Amino acid sequence: MDFPREFDVIVVGGGHAGTEAALAAARAGAQTLLLTHNIETLGQMSCNPSIGGIGKGHLVKEVDALGGAMAIATDEAGIQFRILNSSKGPAVRATRVQADRVLYRNAMRARLENQPNLWLFQQAVDDLMVQGDQVVGAVTQIGLRFRARTVVLTAGTFLNGLIHVGLQNYSGGRAGDPPANSLGQRLKELQLPQGRLKTGTPPRIDGRSINYSVLEEQPGDLDPVPVFSFLGKASMHPRQLPCWITHTNARTHEIIRGGLDRSPMYSGVIEGVGPRYCPSIEDKIHRFADKASHQVFLEPEGLNTHEIYPNGVSTSLPFDVQYELIHSLPGLENAHILRPGYAIEYDYFDPRALKSTLETKAISGLFFAGQINGTTGYEEAAAQGLLAGANAALQAQGKEPWVPRRDEAYLGVLVDDLVTRGVTEPYRMFTSRAEYRLSLREDNADLRLTEIGRRLGLVDDVRWDAFSRKRDAVAQEVERLKSTWVNPRVLPAHAAEALLGKAIEREYSLSDLLKRPNVSYEALMQARTDEGELLAGPGVLEDDVLAEQVETQVKYAGYIARQQDEVQKHLSHEQQPIPADIDYDAVTSLSFEVRQKLKTHRPETIGQAARVSGVTPAAISLLLIHLKRLHYGSRKQAA
């Protein structure tokens, strides 16, 4: 039967991409339906119980700045918070959180159930309704037809999912869940370009059987305690727990090598390529044969369970080999395994067949987000989900889409990399992928994106008010530092030497003094004149987050200004559109190879064309000349 109500947006799948897509579409004002095979697993953390990390934390902050739920749910569920690279520059500092799986899932479900314009329905989707080249809805496994103007597909690892433990395998979307084989077959019929990838997970351990006395404890950060969301507070956090560290050894490596003949990866059973930056333990032993030991992080899965996630020993080896390798690790000699590790192989679709909005080029109104696009990680999925959900809603409402630029957001880097370069292995975000990472910091994600989110309808009044207060306070303080001047009479030699290491010889603004590498905002604000008055005067920021933002903006102002100059130079051609119907064969000045690559990738802009592998700067110059001729010819005809 046809469901009696029509929707603007249908989201298929309730993982990290699907939940953010549904929430974003609903926040943008679209009547949204989230279809999931199991409402109980909405927001499920299928693999590791952590969120964030280098590059990944930046994406979570951006999702949060755009009104998304991942960061605030993590603040409510996080049982250990750390800032990675805390001793390095602000561009590469990143938040990483251990999360209680149940608390996180509950936090996400509460937001989904209380989001206006959003309906949930429990049914697996077996088919898409397509008329011509336009998607018009989805069909569930009981034949129920839901109609919508747009559909966002976030199928994760469920499309023709195949789980491997040793040489045995069975169909599944993840352990305990069925695969989406019918939907996978339907997508093949639509002739969208696809491939196979794989990912894996380690065996889980009963913490009561671990000897913690021989392990290294890894506590979270306590002073200050980090928060993930710009609206987060440390008081939201539940009870905190430590992680523990052990190491593999020669015996572990010997056990693994002895089992490689029964490994599905090394016996050719698995065809899909695994993630380079999250390799299985057998892959580590094979690729880094000269390394005597590898770290294994024992991460708690939650406050009300003894289950431990041994991060670093993801494996698809037979269970008897898993059993031996776990018991070879110090502290785990008597460990009880609760669940076996496994690898899962699944279909993904070449993201070069997507527009930068994450809409498929072949089927209007159909958007893809998450692992279906060849990415790995909760954070990458959530970011894509938010963008796809927002753009699906905008399209359903007849509005212009939003495409973040590479200089605007890590989300822009992620999407641009996917749609121009494609993937040959699961894609993971790193800060090194961003050319403009000094401007794309965790701490300024809201200053970069919240105004855009407000314009798109993604940011509510509470977030907007908090952001506006922060933005204005930071701007006022930066301006105050620029306009407040001190001279040798006001800052005598002994005070200057204490603050700066030497006396000042002329007049300086407070901003000039703060730019010096050994001067902090806090020290500058505490400096006093001979009369005992505060050098900085009234108006000092007491909020540490705001003070850090001011210090970063002032200290890096010169570098950021130079980077912005670079951005402006690139933007003139970066955003120049290429006609969708361009005939590359008519651009005879281009080599045959370049013409073939451009015909295959069909880039939407000059910037995208420049990032296609094998397309040289000289070829871009020739393409620009051709586009100018086309433009001149069309103007001449119009006249």
UniProtKB/Swiss-Prot annotation:
Its cofactor is FAD. Keywords: Cytoplasm, FAD, Flavoprotein, NAD, tRNA processing. Gene3D superfamilies: FAD/NAD(P)-binding domain, GidA associated domain, C-terminal subdomain, tRNA uridine 5-carboxymethylaminomethyl modification enzyme MnmG/GidA. GO terms for biological process: tRNA methylation; tRNA wobble uridine modification. GO terms for cellular component: cytosol. FAD binds at G13, G14, G15, H16, A17, G18. NAD(+) binds at residues 274-288. One of its GO terms (molecular function) is flavin adenine dinucleotide binding. It is found in: Cytoplasm. NAD-binding protein involved in the addition of a carboxymethylaminomethyl (cmnm) group at the wobble position (U34) of certain tRNAs, forming tRNA-cmnm(5)s(2)U34. Homodimer. Heterotetramer of two MnmE and two MnmG subunits. Belongs to the MnmG family. This is tRNA uridine 5-carboxymethylaminomethyl modification enzyme MnmG. The gene is mnmG.
